[in-house]
Structure formats: structure tokens, C-alpha cells
Amino acid sequence: IDALLHRVDGILLSGGAALNPLWVGEEPHSALGGINPLRDAFELLLIRRAADHQIPMLGICRGMQILAAALGGKLEQDMTSARPDVALLKHSQNAPRAEATHRVKLLEDSFLGQLLGREIFVNSFHHQAVADTGTQFRAVGFASDGTIEAMESTTFKSILGVQWHPECMDNEDSARLFRHFVQQCASYYRARQWHQHHLSLDSHCDTPMFFDQDIDFNRRDPKILVDAFKMAEGGLDASIMVAYLAQKERTPEAHLAATAKADGILDRLTAMVEHCPSARMAFSPEEVRANKAAGYRSILPGIENGYAFGTDLANVAHYRQRGIVYTTLCHNGNNEICDSARPNALDKERFPATNGAEHGGLSAFGREVVAEMNRVGMMVDLSHAAESTFYDALAVSKVPIVCSHSSSKVLCNHPRNLTDDQLRALAAAGGVAQCTFYCGFLRTDEENATIDDAVAHMLHMIKVAGVDHIGIGTDFDGDGGVPGLASASELITLTRRLQAEGLTDHDL
């Protein structure tokens, strides 16, 4: 099926026979009509895999019902038996198929309500119905007897379902619905073409944090947001996976332990990729390009927290020899290198007069670290760094620096985000800020963050710094991910959204 889906830009699921209730764990009702077992099996799998690939889908009548069944909803095998106390409309009309026989009311705040209006007239040819859309859909259209007549995705996918048969009705409502579906298919095609011919990079991913949970990168593992399958589905060519180190004690013993932990994580990362036939390690842009040309995904290693260096400058060269492409100078809490944007409780206790600021930016050792990173060809990453550290590093570094996973402070006032002045300064120095998708960095009311907020941050950052100085650093598997951008498989949706905002192939 995946081979088929690579050639498909949209799926229209038509009407037809009833769904075999055994597929949804139910015994057949006496009123069950004819079934098509081969079609059931094929479409149930097709829908799930198409949803993983973010392919637009439109379900009509049975098509809406099987969409719901495939993605977690429930059906009424026979509407009359399921709701004996309800005076049902005649849902299997004797009138000609092109004739409308009842009204459907669409929710005002729904997409279909905005596309078609609050009330439309439809035909009807069914005795089964969607009883519960499940969490992946929202019921947005209803007949006067309460029957669900339309549903749409709750996860920002281009998936719609309607219970009536618009293909039989020669009217503007039907034309609008089909035009919209074709437009979504064209949008998906354009994004897929872009990904086939251009490189895409996620500059920050924390999948190694799940090594202790027996993850399998070589299958679609539900425990992680980035694996070989999800990268392929979302069109992601390369991911920088980091060895994350929480900031702990700053004793000689603790520093040695941090270095050993980083080395252990990197060993496991290398082994993970070596056991994946569709991925390869990469340590330079040239290797990423070569891997894509040969049909492989690229995994690049990074370190999140210069705590791994301890107080030994030689560790910088050691980690570059291991292929590390960047090191985030600090995490939450100061270290020997610099001040953090979020000093920890011990920092604030030790330095109450400065609210935890210890070095006033880079320490003397930190300046040596930045210079050594420049020398060995390792990028300096300033995400998590205090603003004072940011400007010190810009002044010290002889080459452009990055902020691998930071968003806009203007749109979300969080100490981890970047001010517009920082974005301009970073761009002036040739650096890049990668917008991140952690909900708390996108909105102060983080529970409401969605792909809409991620797009807003990216567009603002592009406006301030210029399109050449903004990228993406999802923070997937490190608490990054919001509805619409919930895993690597959904990154093609971001491409579609940015193209819809007017970004050209060259911009992207």
C-alpha cells in the first residue's frame, strides 16, 4: 500500500456496501445488508496509512463511515434499531438520486460551515451511520433527527466526510466541496514535489532520550515521534539527534560522568542507525546530500548541553572527532561555559543579587570553548543560553552560530525565546534560528498551541530576520509537537501551510 500511496495525491472514498461489523468488534445485526470483505480490508488499511502520509481524503456515505471506523470512531449498523426512541427521517430515499430530500445544519465555526453555509439541502441513501466520530474527527453536520451528516479532522489533516452523495447533485454546494478537495490534492502534490527535489532538515530532535524504552527506529514506533517511517511520510531528509544532558552537579566527578553519558548516548545512536537499512549517519552537508541522492535518510549527532565538556577543553575536539555537528552551550541551569536563560534553583540561591546570573554571559572558559568550536568546525548553538551569553558568543565567534530550537519572544514571552533584536543580530552575523514546536514556546496558554501558532512564529521570524536565517528545530521527542505538527510524519503539512502563505520553492 505504501508503494501505491507514493503515487497518490488524494483519495476519494465512495459509497457502497455496509462495513462488516466484525472489523469494529461487533456482531452483525439482523438488518445488516451486503458486505464486501476485500474492500473493507483494503480501505481500512489504506485509510490508516494515508492518514500517516497526510494524504487528503474525502469520504462519501460509506466513505465517511469507514473513515470513522478506521480512525477510532463507531458506527450504527442500523439506525432504526440503534435509536428506537427517535423519529428518524427517511434516510434511504425513493426520490431520484439528484433530488434533495432533507436539510443538514452545519456548525458555524466548522470549515464545512464556512465553505457551504449554515444550512444545505442533501440527498440520502443509507441505513448505517456514524455513531461516534472518535477523537480524530469532529461531527460538524447534523440532520434534524440528530444523525451525523458531516465530520472533519480535529488534527489539521485534509480529511472530510459527508453522509450524502454530492456527486449526484448538480449544484454549487457540491461543486464547492469537490473544488476544495481537488485544491487540497494539488497542495499536497506541490509539497510532495518540493520534498522530492529539495533537502529538508530538522535541527533538533531528542529521540535518544527514549533509548531506555527499547525503541525501534526501523519501524513505525508509537513511543517516539521520529523514526525512519515517520521521516519518510513527512518528507524529512535529515534530523540532528542530540545527546541530552540535564544540568547536575559541577564537581569533577559529575563532569566525568556527564562526558561518559554523552559518549554512551552517541554509541547507541550510531548503533541505532547502523541497524536501519533506510538511514545513514552524516557529519557534513555533503554527506546529507549524498545520502538523499542514494535514497537514505540522514541522522546527524549533536550534544545538548556543554556540560559534556566539563572543564576540559580537549573534549571539544574529542566530540568533533566523533562527528558532533553542534553543541548547545548550556541547558536549564548555568554551567562552566555560560549563563543559562533559565538558571536553576541552586544558581538563584548562589547568586541572588543577579537572579541566578553567574558569569554575566560567557565565562573565560566559555570564550575558549567557542574559539575551539570554531577551530574544529563544530557549530555553536545558543538555544537555552541567556541573552548575555547570546551577545557574548556572537562577539567571540568567528563563524555564524545557530539557535537550534527557539521561537519568537514577541509572540510568546518566554525566556527561552528570541527577541526581534536577537533575531536581527543573528541574521547580521550570518546565523540561523530554528523555530521550535514546543507548546510553551508558542503560546503562553500552551494547552491551546497548534500548527497555526508554529506558522505564525515562523512567518514573524522570517519577516524580522529574513528567510535565509530561519529553519525548523522541532524538539520532537523532547516535548515538542502540537496538533497539526505532532510527529515527523506531519512536517509535509507545514510545507503546505508555508507554501499557502506565499513562500516559494527557493524560500523553503
Region locations from a protein language model:
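Amide-donor transfer/coupling interface in amidating biosynthetic enzymes
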Residues: 1-13, 36-53, 80, 84-193
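Short glycine-rich anion-binding loops that position phosphate/pyrophosphate groups of nucleotides
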Residues: 16-19
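Glycine/threonine-rich flexible loop motifs
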Residues: 21-36, 412
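A short helix->loop->beta-strand "cap" motif at the edges of active sites that frequently abuts
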Residues: 50-56, 297, 378, 399, ...
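Gly/Ala-rich beta-loop-alpha elbow adjacent to hydrolase catalytic centers
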Residues: 59, 63, 68, 72
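Histidine-centered catalytic micro-motifs
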Residues: 124-129, 161-166, 200-207, 385, ...
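N-terminal hydrophobic targeting/anchoring segments and the immediately downstream early-domain regions
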Residues: 190-352, 413-472, 476-507
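Active-site core of metal-dependent hydrolases
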Residues: 329-339, 347-425, 434-439
